[in-house]
UniProtKB/Swiss-Prot annotation:
Pfam families: Med14. One of its GO terms (cellular component) is mediator complex. Component of the Mediator complex, a coactivator involved in the regulated transcription of nearly all RNA polymerase II-dependent genes. Mediator functions as a bridge to convey information from gene-specific regulatory proteins to the basal RNA polymerase II transcription machinery. Mediator is recruited to promoters by direct interactions with regulatory proteins and serves as a scaffold for the assembly of a functional preinitiation complex with RNA polymerase II and the general transcription factors. Its main location: nucleus. GO terms for molecular function: transcription coregulator activity. It is found in: Nucleus. This is Mediator of RNA polymerase II transcription subunit 14. Keywords: Activator, Nucleus, Transcription, Transcription regulation. It comes from the Eukaryota. GO terms for biological process: regulation of transcription by RNA polymerase II. The lineage of its organism: Eukaryota, Fungi, Dikarya, Ascomycota, Saccharomycotina. Component of the Mediator complex. The gene is RGR1. InterPro entries: Med14_N, Mediator_Med14.
Length: 1112
């Protein structure tokens, strides 16, 4: 593009529509390229006379269309030529269709390329317009670049301002024009004649007279009245404690009106401050002329210019306003300087921040800069000039400006006679009392002390309201306005203070807990840590919470130490959830808001306590009251659950135990008694819980004598082992009586009563805790053949004269609870096992004997452990062994089995009976029902079992007879290998199903070494005949189990069996046999004979078979 020279004419204005139209741009957009661009448009030349230059054409990265067509044409020709040559060379090796296919693929590929070229040619027909737009875009970008360069060059011209020539000296030219010569400086080479003293005195006196006249005729500021002196040709205005200024006039004109003042204004002569730094005290003093502060020369000259301008424009009123502001500002400067020194070299270091802003004439003092309530300019004092241009202050705290009349009075005392508008005192008063020095340190002390006092007052009121000290006023009291005496526990007090210098709280002679609480109090509250502003109420609440927490921690630590001293063991692993904690509040008479900052829960236990038993202690930091519970706590699915809990009732007395909830009585005796009371409660609960698990109804007896008298019991039996022991060696720890309801399960009511009594006594012997249990009550109508010595095995004593019994048990709790956790838990949960096992043995002994006697069953002998009875002459005596535990059942044993093993069938039957009794044993066992034996129901009785044994006795005798017969030589049939052809076995499937199993062994001619075995089963079961009251029980003989194809070979055997049964029905016992197809119902007295006959059939069958009468 050609370079553009010359100037650019402004755009033409279209008068018709007011739009600016650029001729050059419009021509370019219209595409007029052949018009030359004008070189100049100045000096009368028009822009339309010369056409603009052509747009430069862009040819970079542009490929001619001819080159593209040439390349693709040559490439297509080359590919066709190469393929034709290749196809000619593969004429013999490739199929003609394959060669044609390759040629077709090449033609299709070239066709696609030429379609693209065709599209490109069509597009090239319109490419001229596209190329022109590209050229135009390039030209516009170049124009933008040239304009940017023009801007840079124009800015560069500003750097040549120093090369300009100076302006002409018009003043000297005018002086030469009027005077004919310039007035050049003399440089003191021309001597000036001296003025005589008389002339000077005369002028001074004239000036004094003129000034007196001027002052008399004009209005002067209020604070200048009576505070000026005219002498030495000037007026001295003195504002007490602020400044002194001297002014004069330049001529002797008498000004009578304000409009003429500009003809003879006042002029500034001298100035000084009537205050300054006292070299003795380094404080700002206001002792008028005794200590003054003069300005440096440069400051004095600047002030002279400003004052003269002010006097010219505003007169004396403007002068006073200016110098009054200047004095107050300078005073602020001196105060700021003093504060800077305090900030660096005094005790205020790191506790004070000063922000002195010259432009605003304001000093901001941020005290307690290290305390979070004031840190970051949240509590400060502003010293500055108010709207009346007086030195004043504002106190900002708790997020707002505060007005404190007491603090304002103290400030005014130190700033008196400084501010405008204050009344001037009489001369006599000024002579007596001089103004005090302005002590910034004292002012700061006043502020921080007052703020500290206010904070401590709020803390006192809030803590007093929280602790509710109406009934106990000694909980909190004042020592000084900055110190509080707080009762941290019933026996200790602490002094809580605030440091006015730093604003931090602390304790005097602190312990580690107090140090932690002080650190917490001096830290921002957790609830407002994310806020920029912390209100004093939040701070006070944090302090009160911290002090409450301190009381809680100290009181809790005292209790903790005393518990540890008295051999309590702390458990800090247990943590109860909110639900479990809420269960504790159910015991409070008044609602108690559980808060970790107000109350604290601790868990303790004794070394000899059962596992999972704990003493829970809750200490209140508000009321200093302790709460105690005894609880059993276990971990369930990772969470601690309270299984049982009972509040420890204080202010109650038991033998040798007296505890109270008065915090002042938490001494060694209290905690020693606490251990005893808790242990008693645990033992008491464990006994009651064990009674509950045994489904025994009970009632704790408070008035023992009345209850015993009601049930005709004279008194509680005395302990023989404690009668001869003095109380010092075996002191009584705890004693209680529980009345137990006897619902005929513990003892027969016929022989006893509906109420039994359990006496519990805890004694301490040689530092070992023992529990003596005594179960006693009425007992009568006994038929036991035991001697008293025999009952000693059960710790049982029976007084048949008084119809009274008692069972004793002595348990060493120390040895039981000192074992391993699992062992101690198992033993301590079964404290009543022995005494109730003995009672259960007595109960069963009475009930079984009563049942046997009522059913006239012969009792051979009885003891506390077993009963020997006679069932039948053909059966051995039966021993009924009583269980050792209440949960066990009785056990039946044959007397012969004890001696020499006995009958195996009888032993098998008894094993079945014992197994059944262990599974289905119930109280119905002692029912007087002869028909209750095992018949498919889950009930039985001892009478039913005895009758069952009588009924099954013929079967057992038949089994013995069959076995004896088969052992005889004439019945012993052998195979070729010596094995018996017939084997007999008895099978007890259940007590109601007995099977006679006959095994038939044989050999086949084809396999003489192989033994085959067939089984023939005859089943016996008991059936109840409801229509016959005399002979109710029948025995069913069934042959249905043999109905199978394998037993067809034994047709002759079954014919013999049925014939034998039919022959038995022809005699006198025919009425006792009932035929049912393959089953027979017979009386128990006939079943033995029939089974022997059936066994003889097997022998007869084998004899006939051996004689060749039957073929397999």
């Amino acid at each position: 593009m050609d370079e553009i020279h010359g100037e650019v004419s402004p755009p033409a204005i279209n008068r018709s529509n007011g739009a600016l139209v650029s001729d050059n741009i419009s021509q370019v957009v219209e595409g007029v390229d052949n018009v030359e661009r004008p070189a100049k448009v100045a000096k009368g030349y028009s822009a339309a006379n010369r056409p603009p230059p052509e747009l430069p054409h862009i040819t970079n990265n542009v490929i001619p269309l001819s080159n593209v067509l040439k390349f693709y044409t040559q490439e297509a020709f080359k590919q066709i030529t190469t393929l034709v040559e290749n196809l000619a060379s593969t004429k013999d090796s490739e199929d003609d269709s394959v060669r044609k296919k390759k040629f077709l693929e090449l033609i299709i590929a070239l066709r696609q390329d030429f379609i693209k070229i065709y599209t490109l040619v069509k597009w090239a027909a319109n490419s001229k317009d596209v190329s022109r737009f590209i050229d135009l875009l390039n030209w516009l970008r170049m124009q933008e670049f040239y304009f940017d360069q023009l801007t840079f060059q124009l800015n560069a011209l500003n750097g040549y301002s120093g090369a300009k020539l100076p302006n002409s000296d018009l003043i000297t030219s005018l002086e030469v024009l009027f005077k004919g010569r310039p007035q050049l400086p003399s440089y003191n080479y021309i001597k000036i004649p001296k003025i005589s003293p008389e002339k000077t005195l005369e002028v001074m006196q004239d000036l004094n007279l003129i000034l007196m006249t001027r002052i008399a005729l004009i209005d002067i500021p209020k604070r200048f009245i009576n505070n000026y002196v005219i002498k030495d040709g000037r007026i001295y205005f003195s504002v007490p404690n602020e400044f002194q200024v001297s002014i004069t006039v330049a001529n002797d004109m008498i000004i009578e009106s304000h409009d003429e003042y500009t003809k003879s204004p006042f002029y500034f002569i001298d100035f000084k401050f009537l205050f300054g730094i006292n070299p003795d005290t380094s404080l700002i003093t206001h002792r008028d002329n005794k200590i003054v502060t003069k300005l440096p020369r440069s400051s004095h000259e600047n002030l002279e210019k400003i004052v003269n301008a002010t006097l010219l424009n505003q007169g004396l009123h403007g002068l006073y306003d200016l110098l009054h502001k200047f004095s107050i500002s300078f005073k602020l400067y001196l105060i700021a300087k003093q504060l800077k020194e305090l900030q660096i070299n005094t005790r205020w270091r790191n506790n004070l921040q000063v922000n002195y802003q010259n432009g605003k004439s304001l000093i901001i003092l941020n005290y307690w800069s290290g305390q979070y309530l004031s840190k970051g300019w949240k509590s400060f004092i502003e010293l500055g000039i108010d709207r009346n241009y007086n030195l004043n202050f504002r106190w900002f705290k708790n997020g707002k400006y505060n007005v404190n009349t007491e603090l304002s009075a103290l400030f005014n005392k130190h700033l008196k006679n400084t501010n405008e508008g204050e009344e001037e005192k009489d001369d006599s008063t000024d002579d007596i009392e001089e103004p005090e020095d302005l002590n910034v340190d004292l002012i700061l002390n006043i502020v921080v002390n007052k703020h500290s006092e206010l904070l401590m007052s709020k803390v006192f009121n809030s803590l007093d309201a929280k602790l509710n000290t109406t009934d106990n006023p000694d909980q909190i009291s004042y020592i000084t306005p900055h110190q509080l005496l707080i009762k941290s526990s019933p026996t200790k007090s602490t002094i809580f203070c605030i440091n006015p210098l730093t604003g931090l709280f602390y304790f005097i002679d602190p312990c580690p807990v107090q140090n932690l609480i002080a650190k917490k109090i001096n830290s921002p509250p957790t609830v407002v840590k994310n806020k920029n502003f912390v209100a004093e109420s939040d701070m006070v609440n944090t302090i009160v919470d911290g002090l409450t927490q301190l009381r809680l921690e100290i009181f809790n630590k005292e209790i903790h130490n005393r518990l540890l001293t008295t051999e309590w063991i702390n458990n800090d692993i247990i943590g109860l959830n909110d639900y479990e904690i809420s269960r504790l509040s159910n015991f409070f008479a008044n609602s108690l808001d559980y808060n970790l900052n107000v109350n604290k829960i601790q868990f303790y236990r004794r070394k000899n306590w059962p596992s999972s038993w704990f003493l829970i202690n809750l200490v209140s930091g508000v009321t200093s009251v302790t709460f105690w519970w005894v609880a059993r706590i276990k971990s369930v699915s990772g969470e601690w659950k309270i299984q049982w809990i009972q509040k420890l009732h204080l202010n109650e007395k038991t033998p040798s135990v007296e505890i109270t909830d008065d915090p002042t009585n938490l001494n060694f005796e209290f905690f020693n008694n606490l251990s005893t009371a808790c242990s008693n409660m645990i033992i008491d609960h464990m006994l009651l819980e064990e009674l509950f698990k045994r489904n025994i109804k009970f009632l704790k007896v408070d008035n023992t004598a009345l209850i015993l008298q009601k049930f005709n019991i004279d008194k509680i039996p005395d302990d023989e082992d404690t009668q001869d022991t003095d109380d010092k060696n075996k002191p009584l720890i705890y004693e209680s009586i529980i009345m137990i309801y006897n619902d005929n399960n513990l003892l027969p009511v016929y022989n006893s009563a509906t109420s039994l009594f359990l006496k519990i006594k805890l004694i301490n012997l040689n530092n070992l805790t023992q529990m003596k249990l005594k179960l006693f009550g009425k007992l009568r109508n006994l038929s036991i053949r035991n001697s008293p010595e025999n009952f000693l095995q059960l710790n049982l004593k029976i007084d048949e004269i008084k119809n009274f019994f008692e069972i004793d048990d002595l348990i060493n709790l120390s040895s039981r609870t000192n074992g391993s956790d699992s062992a101690s838990s198992a033993t301590t949960n079964h404290l009543l096992d022995k005494i109730f096992n003995n009672l259960n043995k007595l109960n069963k002994l009475i009930k079984i004997l009563d049942q046997l006697n009522k059913n006239k069953i012969q009792i051979i002998n009885n003891s506390v452990n077993d009963i020997i009875i006679k069932i039948d002459d053909n059966l051995d005596n039966l021993i009924i062994k009583l269980p050792e535990k209440a949960t066990d059942s009785i056990k039946l044993i044959s007397e012969e089995e004890v001696k020499d093993g006995g009958n195996p069938e009888v032993k098998l039957i008894l094993d079945y009976l014992n197994k059944y009794l262990s599974n289905y044993y119930s109280d119905d066992f002692f029912a007087n029902d002869e028909d209750k034996f095992y018949d498919g129901n889950k009930k039985t009785s001892i009478v039913g079992i005895i009758k069952y044994l009588k009924e099954i006795n013929p079967i057992l005798k038949s089994v013995q007879t069959i076995k004896a017969k088969l052992r005889k030589p004439e019945s012993a049939f052998k195979l070729s290998n010596g094995l018996s052809k017939l084997n007999f076995d008895i099978k007890f499937t259940t007590l109601n199903l007995i099977q006679y199993v006959f095994h038939m062994n044989y050999q086949t001619p084809s396999s003489s070494k192989k033994i085959f075995k067939d089984k023939i089963v005859i089943s016996l079961s008991f059936k109840n005949n409801k229509f016959d009251k005399v002979s109710k029980n029948l025995i069913k003989i069934s042959l249905k189990d043999n109905l199978n194809s394998k037993n067809l070979k034994y047709k002759k055997l079954f014919e013999l069996i049925f014939k034998s049964i039919n022959d038995g029905s022809m005699d006198a016992h025919a009425h006792q046999l009932i035929k049912l197809n393959y089953d027979f119902l017979v009386n128990s007295s006939l079943v033995g004979e029939l089974m022997v006959r059936i066994a003889n059939c097997f022998v007869l069958y084998l004899q006939a078979e051996s004689n060749g009468r039957y073929n397999q």
